[in-house]
Amino acid sequence: MTTTSATAVLNGLSSSFLTGGKKTQALLGAHVTARVTTPKRFVVAAAAVAPKKSWIPAVKSGGNLVDPEWLDGSLPGDFGFDPLGLGKDPAFLKWYREAELIHGRWAMAAVLGIFVGQAWSGIPWFEAGADPGAIAPFSFGSLLGTQLLLMGWVESKRWVDFFDNDSQSIDWATPWSKTAENFANFTGEQGYPGGKFFDPLALAGTLNNGVYVPDTEKLERLKLAEIKHSRLAMLAMLIFYFEAGQGKTPLGALGL
C-alpha cells in the first residue's frame, strides 16, 4: 500500500509541469488526509523481584557466609544461614530440609510432653519410666521393640520413599495406603501429605462434601509457621539437655 501511494505521488509530480500544479495539489492533499496507521508500542514491565532475606540483615557483604548462592529463598524459613555449606549439593539440601522437618516435629512433641508430663505427675522427664530397682533405669526389651523394630521399620520405609517417591505405597508394603483414601498424599509434596487423616482440622485445605481439597496459600503459610516453631523447639530441647545434666527440669529451672 505504501509503495502504491508513493508511486501515485511521484506520477502526479511529474505531470504537474503540464497541468499547472492542480493535479499535484490534489494528489498531495489526498495523500496527507489519508489515514495514517502508527505502529503499536508494547511496554514490557519487569516484575519486581523480592530481595532475599538474610540472617544478618545489617550486613550487605560477606560472600557465601552471609548470602549463600545455593540458597535462593524458595524454602520456607530460608534466611541464607548455611555457614558450613551443607546445602551446596541440591540432593543434600533436600535431605537436610527433610531431616530438619522431622527432627523439629519430634522436638515440638517432646517439649509439650515434658511440660505436661512433669506438671501432671511431678516426675522429671529424664526419670520418667525408670525402674529404681533395676540394673538399668529402663527395660531393654521395650527399648529394643520400640526403637529398633517399630521405629526402625517406619524410618527405613521413609528413607526408601525419600529417594524413590511413592515407592512404599504399594499394597504389599503398606496395605492401607492404596485402599484408604485418607492416607494418600493430597498436596503432592514430600513431608506434607495433608488429607483428612494428616490434616483433620483442614488447616491447610478445605473439605467439600467430605473431599479434602488442599489450599496452596494456607499450606505455604503453615509451612513457615511450622519450621519456625520446629527450630524453637529444637533449641529448647538442647537447653533441656543441659539442664538435665545439672539435675534440673525446665519447670525447676524456672522456679516452678
Curated annotation (Swiss-Prot):
Source taxon at top rank: Eukaryota
GO BP terms, alphabetized: photosynthesis, light harvesting in photosystem I; response to light stimulus
Coiled coil: none
A Gene Ontology molecular function term of the record: chlorophyll binding
Keywords, comma-separated and alphabetical: Chlorophyll, Chloroplast, Chromophore, Membrane, Photosynthesis, Photosystem II, Plastid, Thylakoid, Transit peptide, Transmembrane, Transmembrane helix
Transit peptide: 1-45
InterPro entries the UniProt entry points to: Chloro_AB-bd_pln (IPR001344), Chloroa_b-bind (IPR022796)
Entry membrane topology: Multi-pass membrane protein
Keyword Nucleotidyltransferase: no
GO cellular component, one term: chloroplast thylakoid membrane
Protein name stated in the entry: Chlorophyll a-b binding protein CP24 10B, chloroplastic
Higher taxonomy: Eukaryota, Viridiplantae, Streptophyta, Embryophyta, Tracheophyta
